[in-house]
């Protein structure tokens, strides 16, 4: 049996169709809360859609979803999508609460490259259907093609 992980999501990955486009999988999810963190927006975004980031914020809690049992190939694709090699995001181990239980998980939090661009709030409702379609039909296929060229 392959090793799987849980991943806390709070932004574009809240949309199951975005996760499915990246990973080719549908995941069971739980509503979850990540303590001492807050979702923020960016003043500039490389995408046509508004992009969120997750920052540490003592005493605050961020609502999100917990993707359950994500396998290695999907994690590799999600890592690539979140550009952890570029410093845009960092992958960090966290503890989240869901259904009255604590879960160990990973999340993609703001990296050093995006710190200067934190600005305001971000809500899923800010992403239009057209922007979501652009991410799914244009951005993700290009990303997956680039990922394929990096596979040994």
Listing of model-derived features with the role each one plays in the protein:
Residues 1-152:
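Glycine-aromatic micro-motifs
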């Amino acid at each position: 049996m392959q090793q799987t992980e849980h991943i806390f999501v709070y932004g574009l990955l809240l949309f199951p169709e975005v996760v499915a486009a990246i990973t080719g999988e549908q995941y069971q999810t739980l509503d979850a809360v990540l303590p001492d963190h807050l979702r923020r927006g960016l003043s500039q975004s490389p995408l046509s859609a508004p992009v969120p980031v997750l920052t540490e914020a003592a005493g605050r809690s961020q609502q999100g979803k917990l993707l359950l049992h994500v396998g290695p190939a999907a994690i590799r694709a999600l890592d690539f999508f979140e550009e952890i090699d570029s410093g845009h995001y960092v992958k960090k181990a966290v503890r989240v609460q869901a259904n009255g239980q604590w879960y160990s998980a990973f999340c993609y939090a703001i990296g050093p490259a995006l710190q200067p661009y934190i600005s305001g709030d971000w809500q899923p409702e800010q992403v239009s259907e057209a922007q979501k379609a652009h991410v799914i039909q244009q951005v993700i296929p290009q990303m997956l093609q680039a990922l394929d060229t990096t596979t040994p």
